[in-house]
Amino acid sequence: MKYLEILQFNPIVDVIQFNRLSERDYQLDALHNFVYPDYFLETILPEFVKNMVFGGHDQKGIQVIGSYGTGKSHLMGLVQLVAENADNLAELRNEQAREIMQPIAGKFMVHRFELQHNNSLWRIVTFEIQRFLDSHDIDYKFDENSLKSYGEQLSEMMAAFEDKYPDKGFILAIDEMLQFLRLRAESGNLESELPVLQALGQACNNTKFVFMFGVQELIYSAREFQFAADMLRKVKDRYRDLSIRREDVSYVVQKRLLDKTEQQKAIIREHLKPFTPFFADMHGNIEKYVNLFPVHPSYIENFEKIKLAQSQREILKTLSRQFDKIKDNDISENEPGLITYDQYFEQMMQDASMMANPDFKLVSDTVHLVHDKIENNFEGPRLSLIHISEPTRLLSIS
């Protein structure tokens, strides 16, 4: 029995790129392939709509939190695509999602972009908004020498926008914010950027302006920003924080990456039964093991804790690559056949750029030394314990 005989493999080979969301084929792929965990339907999507619907109260900017590759850009892209084109509502493969997003469908114009790191946030934001305004013949110019507050200028910009498009709102979306803020903090400029974030969030209240961005972790709790804690609290008051949870990532793995019929689940359940005595939690969590098979449930939990290597931490892409290697293999009756998080280190070792990170190089050099000693002194399945310890060491230095 091969892996591909007991599940439907739908690989995720790339994360959503904002700069391609204007391409129709790309849009349809993003709309059709979105997976809807219950938490998205119960909380995340309703919160988006609440903060976007015209005439709402206490509306704020939107901060979407999730590790690399967990679907932040896909989630924001989905909302934007429906908001800018009502026809896209019918392309959603979930009836409840269509009902939730009906109030915002086709109500907005959208400008999305990825942050460059060589300028101040206000200069970048006003440049991008100006580019949008000029392309739509909206009569407003930002003055870089203006003494008006950020909020005043945003208000004037929206007034000009609504003069031209009275029935539309305006969404400004940034793909990733955290790395930009970290670099600004390193250069001593963070405190000048936080008032801009505050103003952008505040501009969303009782207007048709929506500002959203993605981050890998809450900017308020990032330890490198705590020297600006007072200002961060003011920023926090202006944003809704929508977090993609570990359970949501597991759901995407189950329903899109490694989907299974009930008959296939029964086969997997029978395959795993002989191994339950060897896993402390398998008996009580057999359905979790079955639904995620062949991924060990602890893989996702440990994977997201590793803070090294941006591209390597794209969990859905990483699992796609790892399963692609074994999909045509026979499943041994003598082994559970699980993808465990120790295999992740092997993949990282193949990335030459990782050696530029001194922490990773230290772990790598130590592992090679231990490997050599074990190879020369022991026999049998002894290296697997070392592989297990490798990502554990990375967790301690992340």
Protein language model regions, located:
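P-loop NTPase catalytic cores that bind/hydrolyze ATP
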Residues: 77, 123, 168, 172-175, ...
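Conserved P-loop NTPase catalytic core
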Residues: 99-109, 114-119, 198-330
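Conserved P-loop NTPase "ATPase switch" module shared by AAA+ and STAND
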Residues: 162-190
